[in-house]
């Protein structure tokens, strides 16, 4: 049996490490491997921590390995990184924050170079700014716009920052082959021969290390349950090496029917959420959020309003409901149509592709979200469902919406109605128009049978160019606005049908012209052949 060689501060854990087997190997071999790879070079480590069982097992393994090293060998930084999407399931995000703080505090006491860092999406890439601000539809399997913006990009930016400081980094993940076969295949494909490392699929100078990739779920829980059987006087059941306790994590899994965790996503090959896992409470990739439903049934009833809100968003993704909640125009200002199917006549009528959510629904949903936030805090749950920077960003998105510019500037009023107070709203320095201007413009536009939104966009363009000595590109911008689809869907479809008929006529005319040209060529060839035949006959007659 393998014995741990480097066991400097592991007196309470040494028997556990030397005697317990994981995936058919002594735990001592895994700890020694971590120590060997850690000491092999000066590349710092970035440990992805999602708060779930697998990432908790990885940080536990690394923590034990570092405890076993003499202080002089603990020279390399270990950055413990979690990704906060700002819409994480509340009980999960609370557990992550507390655990991260305890790990860093325990590491400081033990003299380990571990620091904790939380990354989050940039304000313009958050869930609410995109959904409520820009009107992006709730994510689905076919349009999962959230993963890259909210998870991949923040973690990638952190890794890139460390690469710029240290030239290279090693990213330590809790990926297991039994959890994600596709992820295991990707890592194996990029494996560096003769090492336990793999090249990152997208980030240069970043390398992947998966120390528990062969473990099964029982191995993970065995490590998290701890060494209490070997040191009953010093270590309690579920106690972790930094002085915390893993029982809340176990309880969380039990209360949610062991749904699993949402992994720290670092690239497209990492399985994202959407399969009844812990993750974003707003996730609509699945029909039902079974994890949250189970948590509510097992004592977290206060989260019921969040589940109801999430179910509302999921309802809007049903194909039969899309036309109700979503604009018929895309954010480009144009109506898009489905591509013709194989074998379908080009003249066949095609369905339009819905665009962003109507502004009126975004306004309604923002108010409902703020009411839920207010009520939960009044009940004693300290929670932020939407941040102030997000509210400011959403307001700007509404004011400058490409299809429905919010000249009424409704967001401050919505916030005031819910909270009976104002935020420090930015006053637009470009003479932003107000509700009275919008009312007047709508009234005048109706008399001239033009879309008031088009006139609003034209006026906004003029204001934005006011005072410039060179109004470069203004005609292109004017043309872009005028070429958008303005009017009702029926009017736009009538224009599209007329254009389609004209195109059909053009296509048919082109075909007729082509056939006539070919006919002329054939006729000419027939004439030439006939003339040639006559000449041959005359030559034959003269020869006789």
Model-derived regions, located:
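Nucleotide-activated chemistry modules centered on ATP-dependent adenylation/adenylyltransferase
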Residues: 1-46, 56-544
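The Walker A (P-loop) glycine that initiates the GxxxxGKT/S ATP-binding motif of P-loop NTPases
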Residues: 49
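Conserved G/P- and acidic residue-centered "switch" motifs that form tight phosphate/ATP-binding loops
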Residues: 52
